[in-house]
Amino acid sequence: VNLLKKKQLWEEIPPRRNYIDVDNLTKWVQAIIEYKGRGQENETNKDFLLTLILTGLFRNECESLHWKNIDLEEGTLSFINPYNNVYYKIYMGNFLWYLMKKRRIQNKGEWVFPSVKSESGHIINISKFRKKINEQCNLSFTFQDLRRTFYFLLNNLTNKSLVSKRTDQYEEKLDVKNIAHAQDMRNRMNKVEQIILGPYRDELIKSININL
């Protein structure tokens, strides 16, 4: 497994666009937590936005996450980049790991973010919900802004990638070097989580009430 270069396509922040600055992140997270909606759909939409900003995925990548993309034992999320058809793996921070475990307990279907209203079976473009959060926190953001926010923070925290890229079809041996590499990526992802979720991170983890 080789680390991606910082400037590879998947990680680039498109120019001349917005992101949620650090001063407004707490307000944004608070709006998601406090938003009062109905039923499972509301919770799915909230979890989707949090996953988007904590992974840097494109909207369509996150919408179509399948449970086969999630390794709950290892705490990783994998996907194929539609732009270069390459397989990537992200080591989740602890909150996101808890969130995925919670969602799996609640959802035994094939999609991480299911929707009974969609022909595909998973959520598609929840712009109405995004706009409600916009109004609640008095911020204007797009789905792509969440991706840019993640990479803005990542690029200011470290010049190392938080993503692994598989370059061949062989599994790597579980040696000390690889274990240290995985833990390093997890630690850095936790730092990103701490900045994004701020004072709400520990509260959110405690509210899930399950073990990793």
Enumerate the language-model features and the residues they cover.
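Conserved short hydrophobic patches within well-ordered secondary structure
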Residues: 29-32, 54, 153, 193-200
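C-terminal secondary-structure termini that scaffold catalytic or DNA-interacting sites
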Residues: 106, 115-118, 181-212
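Basic, Lys/Arg- and aromatic-enriched nucleic-acid-binding interface segment
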Residues: 1-59, 63, 106, 147
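Active-site/catalytic core of tyrosine-dependent DNA strand-transfer enzymes
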Residues: 21-26, 93-139, 150
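Short, polar N-cap/turn motifs at the start of nucleic acid-interacting alpha helices
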Residues: 69-76, 140, 158-179, 202-206
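Catalytic-site neighborhood detector that most strongly recognizes the C-terminal catalytic loop/helix
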Residues: 19, 81-85, 167-195
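Conserved tyrosine-mediated DNA breakage-rejoining catalytic core shared by Y-recombinases
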Residues: 3-8, 55, 64-101
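C-terminal catalytic core of tyrosine-transesterase DNA break-rejoin enzymes
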Residues: 50, 54, 60-61, 146-170
